[in-house]
């Protein structure tokens, strides 16, 4: 059975790999010259199931209003006049209740924990190398109020059986020795020992090599124009003016997925959350982080690779704009300089931006659609690297008519209600 996978980020590539392992003939198509050239290229480097949390949370609307007035705010909104932006923000606000937060976080943790286990299994079986570390994640609280507010997340961790450790100020240096000199700036920390780190772009490149060895064909620099449908099935994909056909189709185009789905009458509430990163060469390994540190105040992650520090964060709701805002670089430099002043020189860093495909409830969209042979694997937000292996494996099981190893409740697009309308004559501009 032939499967056409649209998109070669970490999620699309993981989908292709697990589909090939399940015995499918797989072709991957992407507009870029190689895998992981967009959102997966320079993300924060975290594999953090325990910190899988929706942006839509109680108190966020009030915080967002305050953030709009702050120079180093973790969230910024640039109104584009796009109706989809307004609709997405309205849906997000509806998910900012305690009840919705608990449901959404449970779904995200369920998939993220499974995905981490799939990554462990993959690494044990294949020896795939991607500058990975299995040393946990430490969330830093600069105020007692932040430390107290962590109670709701700890409750979810306990219900999900996720190990954690609450650290006082003096204990933080035990897991992150370089923070000893700045411990006076901190009130405490929450450590998740089972979280991991690694270079997502390097992982995706190596996984693509393994997928090729299983027979997967990658076609790069090809322009995906639109999906052709006939009744309740996809008849093919128009790529550079030619109709490509397969038995099954997997859409893994991240933030560009809605553009391909809307003409089919499928409204996928996936909107780009623009993020930024700095990749800083390490100057003193002893003064650099050991794993990943999360600064709760600025929502910035600082991650250790072999000879580099990856500093990632921010969220801009600003459409598909990929311009680099120097103010965001200033924030990232400020945070890493404040916590690790001797770890590396931010002036030598590489500054990057990417678009995270976010849903209003934080949970990705994985599985079937109203079209019998079209499947989705998109909407992972800031957790594409964390969720990639599990999402790919779940998707492969669904296509193979196997029962996935975890519950898929609440993961497919049908949680948003009716999605199929009649759009006979809609032909969008090329999305990917």
From Swiss-Prot:
Its cofactor is FAD. Pathway: Amino-acid degradation; D-alanine degradation; NH(3) and pyruvate from D-alanine: step 1/1. GO terms for biological process: D-alanine catabolic process. It is an enzyme of class 1 (oxidoreductase). Pfam families: DAO. SUPFAM superfamilies: FAD-linked reductases, C-terminal domain, FAD/NAD(P)-binding domain. GO terms for cellular component: cytoplasm; plasma membrane. Its EC number is 1.4.99.-. Keywords: FAD, Flavoprotein, Oxidoreductase. FAD binds at residues 3-17. Signal peptide: none annotated. It catalyses: a D-alpha-amino acid + A + H2O = a 2-oxocarboxylate + AH2 + NH4(+). It comes from the Bacteria. One of its GO terms (molecular function) is D-amino-acid dehydrogenase activity. Oxidative deamination of D-amino acids. Belongs to the DadA oxidoreductase family. This is D-amino acid dehydrogenase. It comes from Stutzerimonas stutzeri (strain A1501) (Pseudomonas stutzeri). The gene is dadA.
């Amino acid at each position: 059975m032939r499967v056409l996978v649209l998109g070669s980020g970490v999620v699309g590539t993981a989908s292709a790999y697990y589909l090939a392992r399940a015995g499918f003939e797989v072709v991957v198509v992407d507009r870029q010259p190689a895998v992981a050239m967009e959102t997966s290229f320079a993300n924060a480097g975290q594999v953090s199931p325990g910190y899988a949390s929706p942006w839509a949370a109680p108190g966020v609307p009030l915080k967002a209003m305050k953030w709009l007035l702050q120079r180093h705010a973790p969230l910024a909104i640039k109104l584009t006049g796009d109706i989809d932006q307004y609709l997405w923000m309205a849906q997000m606000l509806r998910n900012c209740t305690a009840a919705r937060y608990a449901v959404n976080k449970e779904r995200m943790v369920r998939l993220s924990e499974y995905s981490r286990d799939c990554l462990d299994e993959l690494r044990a079986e294949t020896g795939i190398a991607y500058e990975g570390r299995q040393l946990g994640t430490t969330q830093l609280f600069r105020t007692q109020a932040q430390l107290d507010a962590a109670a709701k997340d700890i409750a979810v961790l306990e219900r999900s059986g996720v190990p954690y450790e609450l650290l006082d100020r003096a204990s933080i240096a035990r897991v992150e020795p370089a923070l000893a000199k700045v411990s006076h700036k901190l009130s405490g920390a929450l450590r998740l020992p089972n979280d991991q780190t690694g270079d997502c772009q390097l992982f995706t490149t190596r996984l693509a090599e393994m997928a090729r060895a299983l027979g997967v064909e990658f076609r790069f620099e090809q322009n995906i124009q639109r999906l052709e449908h006939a009744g309740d099935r996809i008849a093919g994909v128009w790529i550079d003016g030619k109709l490509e056909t397969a038995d099954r189709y997997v859409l893994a185009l991240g933030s560009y997925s809605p553009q391909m789905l809307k003409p089919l009458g499928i409204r996928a509430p996936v909107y780009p959350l623009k993020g930024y990163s700095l990749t800083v060469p390490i100057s003193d390994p002893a003064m650099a982080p050991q794993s990943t540190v999360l600064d709760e105040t600025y929502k910035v992650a600082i991650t250790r690779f072999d000879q580099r520090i990856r500093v990632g964060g921010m969220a801009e709701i600003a459409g598909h704009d990929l311009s680099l805002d120097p103010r965001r670089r200033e924030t990232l430099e400020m945070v890493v300089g404040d916590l690790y002043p001797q770890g590396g020189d931010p002036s030598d860093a590489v500054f990057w931006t990417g678009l995270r495909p976010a849903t209003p409830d934080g949970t990705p969209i994985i599985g079937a659609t109203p079209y019998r042979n079209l499947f989705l694997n998109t909407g992972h937000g800031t957790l594409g690297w964390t969720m990639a292996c599990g999402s790919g494996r779940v998707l492969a099981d669904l296509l193979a008519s196997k029962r996935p190893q975890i519950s898929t409740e609440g993961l497919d697009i049908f949680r948003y209600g009716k999605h199929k309308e009649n759009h006979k004559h809609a032909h969008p501009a090329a999305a990917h």
